[in-house]
Amino acid sequence: MTWKRLILALPGGAPEDLSEAMAADLAEDLLASWTALWHPELIHQAQTIPEWKRSDPSALDVEQALVLVPKASQSLMETTLRERLTVLESEAIESRSDRLSTASAMRALLATRSPSTPSACWDRWQDEFFALGFAYWQLHLIIRQLRYSSTLNSVLFQEQLLHAAQAVAKEDEAEAERWLQSCFDQLAQERDHHFAQAVHLIDVVLLHRPPDDSQSKHLTSATHAQFWIGDFPQWISPDSSGNWLESIRENGQIDLAGGGDPLAVIPWLEESFALEQLAENRQIYCQHFGRAPEVYATFAPSLHANSPRQLLASGYKSTLLLDWQAARYPQSSQAKIYWEAPDGSCIDAISNQVIDAAQVASFLHLGTRIGKQMDYHQVPTLLLTHWAGQSSWPMEDLLRVARRSPLLGSWIRLPEYFASTQRPYHQERLTASKFPKQPLPVDGSQLAADDVRWSVQRDMTAVRNLSVLLQQLDGWLGRQPLPQVSYDWHWSDDTLKPDPTRPQVTAELGSNDQETPASPSTSCQPALFLKVGRCLALSWQEDAAITARQPLSRVAREIVPAARRCIEGLRDRMPHSSDSLASKKRLFLVNPWSGPRRLLLENLPLQAVEESESTRVYASHSHSQGDQAVVDVVVDVPPMGILQVSDETRVIKKKKLPLIAREPGVLGNEFIEAHFDLASGRLKGTYAPNHRGNRLSGMLAVRLPEHGSGGASYSQMKATGMKLLKSNPVVGRILFQGDLVDGSTTLGHYEIEYSLFRGSRVLDIAVHCTGLQLPAANDLKHYLCWRTAWANISGIVSLWQHGTKTTMPTGWSYCPSLLEIDEADHREYLLPNGLSRHRRLDDRFLDSLLPIVNQEGAFWFGIGLDLPRPRQTCLDHFAKPFSIEESSSEMQTGPSAWFVQCTPSHILVELVASLGRPGEPPQGMRIRLQDHAGRSTVAAVDLFRKPRKASTIDIAGKIWTDLVIEDQKVKVPLKAHESAMVDILWE
């Protein structure tokens, strides 16, 4: 006699009662046991639909039933219960290691009780019936999650199921297919009865290396939509295997994630470098895959608060706001969001609802996840993620269900998904404070590489500004043509070296505008610029920090002659007076930034200089160095301008000024006054002249390991000597020497040099430590730091990351370019100059982690007070003067001239490229404007040449809006934190 019922003994009353925290092995066994009951031979013999019951005597008081007991229920099946089942002519069987083994065991047991109908189709159709059982389980969870009761016509469904099993037994393929499809259709109708909206399923495949031939064949043979995430630009080389590339080109169901190196995540990286990297990666996609990616996603963290602006500018239409390494991105209440950046830029994104398709346990409650999407989300979306070739068997069940019915959702390509859900739905503004703190490796080589990385990108931006400016002057003064298009321009000799391995891509600048030039001159962004981007990306990788510092240092050395050639070119383009003394000593200075730059020039081999508004000399002091007369001078170089400082032999009356080092332990000028503790050498306080109250203090310290329940403690500074290195009305410099001590234990030795010059609002601090006794292992609880404290606990602490000012949270922050403490009357600033790890403690303390290599370290940073242009100051204050000595005649225009300036002063302007066709004079130039203060404004860009037309553009050169030109000034409306690209054409 055969069984009349097929029952799964659950550890709870129903599937919705099962804990989502169930152990993975128990969850896998439970799902495998349920679907194994749906084997067509079992259904055909029992002539019934499988069901579930609670594992207790009252629920399992059933006759002539096969009771399958999964691992989760075996402890509940007491001996008395098993004996009761035997009395009722029922039989309990425990699950096996996997689904097929469990089904085989039940079939074998069935054969001992009742001979079954032999059929060669049992095994061929078993997977389809398993998928039907999987769908039945998930539908129940969906309905219960939506708080409904099932209205499924069980009698009709059972009849259709039995017809399907009967057809399989008779080996009638057509009938089996027809009746099985009817079962799926009836389940889909039941689902639509409660919720008819479509559910979107997205298969995300992660790849950590290029797929080999077998893996590529398996992946590309799939017929459903897939989205691959990997470092594709790095995997493509001239000798790379083209099998997987060809497979992707032929398979229209596979889309690749745009991205590559996570360069854009470096918070202090200038936006131009990030945009250049994004554009270069897209060109690689176009060349090798035949289409540019529309969706941006990388495996490593690569998104930040301003990513929508950069991605839209680079041609991307959407992104995945997902971090596959850890849940560090901000999570939205909706799966599909319209992500708004601080500057108002918006991009479509998916922010959560990821299912690990490699874990069977993820599918036990899949229906509950789908039900929540239907209940709470405007666009029901599920991302099923797995490494290539590592999906679990329920994923195959889901694929079979989706091929037959949209019951559990439909697979969709990501570009189609975003195109069909373009309406904003849920718009969410994600500020920088909501984004996670980045990984904080504290390896000394990584920290030291940060310093070089900062200086390289800063100096490279300055040199590019100079190179574009030089091309503009060539075209304006001498009608010189632009160089031929090349992707390799060696700075030292201007030799054009075409690279045949690089794709020749021309960016179109306009739509139907006949006045728009053909393209920006790509030689304005030579190989040196591209090399900087690659080195910066390499140095971001923790395991490459040591090796990356070497190419970064080489690039830094290449920038020096590049800058000198630009300065010499600018000097030679300036008209000089023929009647002035050519033998007179002069210094030619260039300012590559869009705001005026105040510079200290020490020990110039000049007799004296004239202090006046016309000469741009703010202060000077003549003295002797050995047998030679020298002068210390403070000058103001005009914005993106030039200045010629000339030797003055005649006697000049100067206003007597007080010394900068006016008394022991004090440096002061007209803007800031710093007091130092003579016993330790620490910065005791900074003051605004004629204002009471200490604004800021600081000290060098070693954070000591915590002991017991008490808080962390710090070492103390013990000065062993003090030297007044320099003191005159222009500059003052004090050196403290001493030991870092913890009680009677010496932890290291230090030298701290404080310096301040006339007219400066920044106190320079240079620290050199030796003999440090710190653990070799990385430790965020025991480190060397500069410890900053401020007096006002109500001060608002902010930092700049990715060009955006945001409130600094408590804890670690990574790579801020600038930190601000905003009080009611004053603003204090910490200028890190490459110090990348900062930890805010309590309400008024800050630890800035200092890099150590081989038990010693050297670093230079600054403290500012009431900076008028804080963002530019953190760039230009630590850069070396762009200057050359010359003996040519005076310039006809006077000692100074400017070329580009902008108001208001907090707007930063960069020169991106010259516009025009190779071999012709430049027709215009492309500039970038950035607001770093978080204030909407209309920027007025004043130019050295009369503009004819100006337009804002995207990264591909497509014109967005035409701009107003008034009095030779281009008016550019900017929203808070916005970065705008502008093309300017000359008359």
Residues covered by each model-derived region:
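C-terminal (or distal) subdomains of carbohydrate-active enzymes
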Residues: S307-L312, A335, Q504, E508-E515, ...
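Conserved short loop/turn motifs at secondary-structure junctions
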Residues: G230-P233, L263-V265, P293-L303, L384-Q390, ...
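Loop/turn elements at helix/coil->beta-strand transitions in domains of secreted/extracellular proteins
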Residues: E63-Q64, T220-T223, N251-D255, F289-P293, ...
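Active-site and substrate-binding clefts of carbohydrate-active enzymes
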Residues: T2-P210, S333-L581, F588-P592, D636-P638, ...
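Metal-dependent polysaccharide deacetylase catalytic core of the NodB/CE4 family, i.e.
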Residues: T220-A300, S345-S351
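Acidic, His- and aromatic-enriched active-site or binding-groove loops in soluble protein domains
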Residues: G242-G258, R309-P330, E340-P342
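CE4/NodB-like, metal-dependent polysaccharide N-deacetylase domain
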Residues: H44, P50, S58-E63, S272-S314, ...
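Acidic-and-aromatic substrate-binding clefts and catalytic sites of carbohydrate-active enzymes
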Residues: L207-P211, D231-D239, Y296-H304, W324-P330, ...
